[in-house]
Amino acid sequence: MPLPDFHVSEPFTLGIELEMQVVNPPGYDLSQDSSMLIDAVKNKITAGEVKHDITESMLELATDVCRDINQAAGQFSAMQKVVLQAAADHHLEICGGGTHPFQKWQRQEVCDNERYQRTLENFGYLIQQATVFGQHVHVGCASGDDAIYLLHGLSRFVPHFIALSAASPYMQGTDTRFASSRPNIFSAFPDNGPMPWVSNWQQFEALFRCLSYTTMIDSIKDLHWDIRPSPHFGTVEVRVMDTPLTLSHAVNMAGLIQATAHWLLTERPFKHKEKDYLLYKFNRFQACRYGLEGVITDPYTGDRRPLTEDTLRLLEKIAPSAHKIGASSAIEALHRQVVSGLNEAQLMRDFVADGGSLIGLVKKHCEIWAGD
């Protein structure tokens, strides 16, 4: 399928996707019932969409195009109520978190969807292993060239986005010692990590043509980069965050990305170069492994900075943009999170350290999601 022309969007409009866990009490393992839930709610959703993701234990909640985080929060809140009621009617529960702490990938059923079945044929067991749960945020752009500039600008802050959303310390019944283990699942995919370097939309079109020669890439949706342009929506999509445990934190993360995008495209503070990515994977790893306690390294100077310090600096820089787009509440909440040192990955570990089981942890996550 050829790459579509870049659809012009209103700059800084917002779309958010949350991949949720469908679990089966009292054992709280992943259920294989997302299709049943989707059928139950499809005529009750008035804004946004509830749909499949890769496997039957995943349920995606997606907003419509929103002007700001308040509109997005309203849509999510309405969807949440409908989904929670449908889940209760079918003796299921819903929760966030980037990974389920003890599910076995071998049990996961790939959705009966042509695209997902084709992906299963291409990637085999890797697709079942990709039963992990992330938050994706789309930001509208006026042109393809703006999208490429924004993509490179946001890529500088991938460690910050990962660290602030880290919520996947447990996997396959084990403490991984990572704050966010979810991104590691995609390391075997040939398109893992950052998009190959291009400097404008014309070069991106050439890149996509080259990738399509592999026969594994039929559309932009087949590319799993950390951040990717979405020409059919006219957006840049940030894909590195774990699904948070609460709806409010998910909205705050979206506000952070929207405000950062506004700052980048209005101030144009960087002249992007290919060398910007020289230490990208090392800095990304620091965020995944240590969260906000990680350290990032400047590829030009070699200076090393604590992620906590650099995140506070970012929040300060984008505060005026956040005010202009109605996202100040998100930036203030994230600032409090960084200063307090609290994060969802550590809260999970604290629960287990206090004697809680992994089954009890999932139950707690369901209570948190339903109570937010």
Swiss-Prot record:
Known EC number: 6.3.2.2
Record's keyword annotation contains Ligase: yes
Record InterPro entries: GCL_type2/YbdK_subfam, GCS2, Gln_synth/guanido_kin_cat_dom, YbdK
Catalytic class of the enzyme: ligase
Alphabetical keyword list: ATP-binding, Ligase, Nucleotide-binding
Recorded catalytic activity of this chain's protein: L-cysteine + L-glutamate + ATP = gamma-L-glutamyl-L-cysteine + ADP + phosphate + H(+)
Listed GO biological process terms: modified amino acid biosynthetic process
Recorded GO MF terms: ATP binding; glutamate-cysteine ligase activity
Pfam families per record: GCS2
Record's subunit section: Homodimer.
NCBIfam families the record matches: gshA_cyan_rel (TIGR02050), PRK13516.1 (NF010040)
Function: ATP-dependent carboxylate-amine ligase which exhibits weak glutamate--cysteine ligase activity.
Family: Belongs to the glutamate--cysteine ligase type 2 family. YbdK subfamily.
Protein name in UniProt: Putative glutamate--cysteine ligase 2
Gene label: ybdK
